[in-house]
Amino acid sequence: SGLAGRYTAVMYVGSNYDEPLPRAFIEDVLTGDAKVLWSGFNIWQLAKNDDDRQAFVARFGWDPSTSYIDSLDKVSTVSYKSQELTRADDNTSGIIAPHVVDKDKVEVLAQANCKDQAGNAANCGSIAQTTGSQYPWAVRSSGLTYIGEIALTYINETDRYLAYADIVDGLLSRDGQAPSRKAAIRIEDVSPNTEVNDLKPLIDYLISEKVPFQIAAIPYYVDANGVYNNGQSLTKTFDQNPELLKLLKYAQRHGGTIVQHGTTHQYGKLNNPYNGVSADDFEFYRSWCTAQQNGGTPVECKTDTWVQLAGPVPSDSVNWAANRVSLGKSELKRVGLGKTKLFETPHYAASWNSYLGMKKAYSTRYERELFFPGMLNKDNAGNKGNFGLFYPYTVKNIYGTKVLPENLGNYEPESYNNHPPRSGADLVNNAKKNLVVTDGNASFFFHPDYPLSELKVAVKGIKELGYTFTPAT
């Protein structure tokens, strides 16, 4: 015992039901001074015998041995810092409801809201041991913070994950620290084939508003199978589109930062999953479409099919990815766009090897990312599943890379591949939900061929929430 005290804070994620705990760890939580954040299962292991139970209740004011998993009540929102955060209807997992026995010792940080099938407030079941339509979702007492579920699944931009992210960030001492309200915008998928008339209005508007911005530039435009070029393969560079290149350099002089967005944003002649064309396909991860959400036989991609992340591409290796990224970086420099410092992975998907390869060329990425089973014990699980995550603030990840957040999503007028449409007003609402995160950013992206009016709605609304647009650094 005593090991926990060597650290600023300790986090325990209870994913395996009834997993045994080392006695030394139990004693550290019950009697130590370290801050502890516990989420999910096995909190009852701290009160397994009478002595431990009495010690826990006396110190923390609630009883884990009589706190039960509520899987009967429908919880579709979580209240935190005066906002209702969403909880996906697909998430049918139960939530452990802390049984509070001494209210004076327990601070309720967030409440689970019980709803009926129509979405209206409903009295919670008796298993929650509460009165009314709420029970504690997160509690804090004497250095121990407990969250009744692992809020890392079924997440989206307005999810209760934001409360989790803020609580995690709060483990670090920040007494008296004012909330940080930074915003960022990225113009997406600008390739040598982009139309100047699509891009210029966005750039002119952002400059006029004195809004710093990023441009995600794809160094090489490739139509490997001639899908849009009469069956003839086509590769194009920025110096073959001189008016566009001139506009990009103008943007750089007026608050624009170039971000390398892959090298070709596609992979050879492979339909990955669509057509082998830049900006459409994945570059560093294999994908295909299926008719069902949970996989099945690959089918031709259509508007209503599901995109599946299938594993590493055939060329996958650390060196392959490093060389490919470096090729694109050199190309941007060759055409006069300077030495880029930020990288964005196409479609936010890469293998473990590819992420490590990217690190050889860039120390900072600006995106969301994937994680894989076995990472903590250094066992590369290859294509045995993946886990996507976004952040509401800047982090340094397990790959050793600094990651700048994109956490609001993008404007999208229509549903595509079962992703819902998202308006400029939706982006503003997402930014509003992110206000619960003390150090939260409001970062989104926007494609050049979409209406300027929607960009204006997003920028204006995010400013009115109190955010300040800054360069992504």
Describe every region a protein language model picked out.
Residues Y12, N16-D89:
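A glycine-rich, often tryptophan-bearing local segment used as a flexible ligand/cofactor-contacting loop or short
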Residues W44-L46, D50-D52, P212, A216-N353, ...:
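Metal-dependent polysaccharide deacetylase catalytic core of the NodB/CE4 family, i.e.
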Residues G32, D175, L202-K210, T237-T263, ...:
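Acidic (Asp/Glu)-rich catalytic clusters
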Residues A183-S191, V196, N319-A322, S326-L342, ...:
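Catalytic grooves of carbohydrate-active enzymes
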Residues D70-S141:
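Catalytic beta-strand/loop cores that center a nucleophilic Ser/Cys/Thr
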Residues D116, A122-K182:
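Non-catalytic propeptide/linker segments at domain boundaries
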Residues S1-T8, P179, L206, I215:
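Aromatic-Pro/Gly-enriched surface loop or interdomain linker
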Residues A163-P179, N197, P201, S208-P219, ...:
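C-terminal domain-boundary segment and adjacent tail
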